[in-house]
Regions:
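Short, aromatic- and glycine-rich surface loops/edge beta-strands on solvent-exposed regions
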Residues: 118-130
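Structural beta-strand segments of beta-rich domains
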Residues: 17-21
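Short acidic/polar inter-strand loop motif in beta-rich domains
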Residues: 127-140
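Divalent metal-coordination and catalytic microenvironments
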Residues: 71, 124, 177
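Exposed aromatic-hydrophobic patches
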Residues: 101-114
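Single conserved hydrophobic/aromatic residue that forms the stacking wall/gate
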Residues: 1-7, 12
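Short amphipathic, basic-aromatic surface patches that mediate peripheral association
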Residues: 24-62
């Protein structure tokens, strides 16, 4: 499916063919420490330091790796009150990616599309390698032996949280595609 169709609708006229998708995702740029040289006066530099704490948008030429691409498939209801539990497949397919500065490229098909005889909507999620994020785990749970959250440790960003707590945790950033609507004719 051409990238121009992302976020739009298409119809499959040839009932003998299933849709084939190609996806490419690249990671975000890794951040360099500090701020770039802006050619600021001493007063401007001090103000920038006070406001930003010495950290600015300062991307390097190196990208984070995409670790996997997940595909979500949604089949619209055919009638009112049709149960949706089996119509939303999150996650439908998962593709592991090799570390590469060039990103990750996958190709897949919905082999059951024609057989099922129903319209479908597809999204993809590109998942980056873990990186540190402020409030990347906003509840910061303590878990019991069964994996249930038994206590939250919220980072409030106020006097309610110790000022030495920077609230930084590891998180897998993700990017979503626009939907692709594929209709039966």
């Amino acid at each position: 499916i051409p990238s121009s169709l992302v976020g739009s609708e298409m119809c499959i006229r040839d009932r003998s063919k299933n849709p084939v998708f190609e996806v490419k995702a690249v990671g975000s740029y890794k951040q360099k420490p500090g701020c770039p040289e802006f050619g600021l006066t001493k007063d401007e530099s001090l103000r920038l330091e006070k406001i930003c704490g010495g950290e600015c948008f300062n991307p390097s030429d190196e990208r984070r790796n995409i670790t996997r691409i997940e595909v979500i498939k949604i089949t619209p209801q055919n009638f009112n009150n049709e149960p949706v539990d089996d119509l939303i497949q999150d996650v439908w397919k998962v593709f592991k990616c090799k570390p590469s500065q060039d990103g990750c490229k996958i190709r897949f098909s919905d082999r059951d599309f024609q057989k099922n005889g129903r319209d479908s909507v597809y999204y993809v999620r590109a998942i980056e390698e873990p990186s540190l994020r402020v409030n990347g785990d906003n509840l910061r749970c303590d878990y019991d032996e069964n994996g249930n959250c038994i206590k939250v440790n919220i980072c409030h960003g106020s006097y309610l949280t110790d000022k030495r707590d920077d609230c930084v945790t590891s998180s897998e950033e993700r990017a979503w595609s626009s939907p692709i609507y594929v209709n039966q004719i």
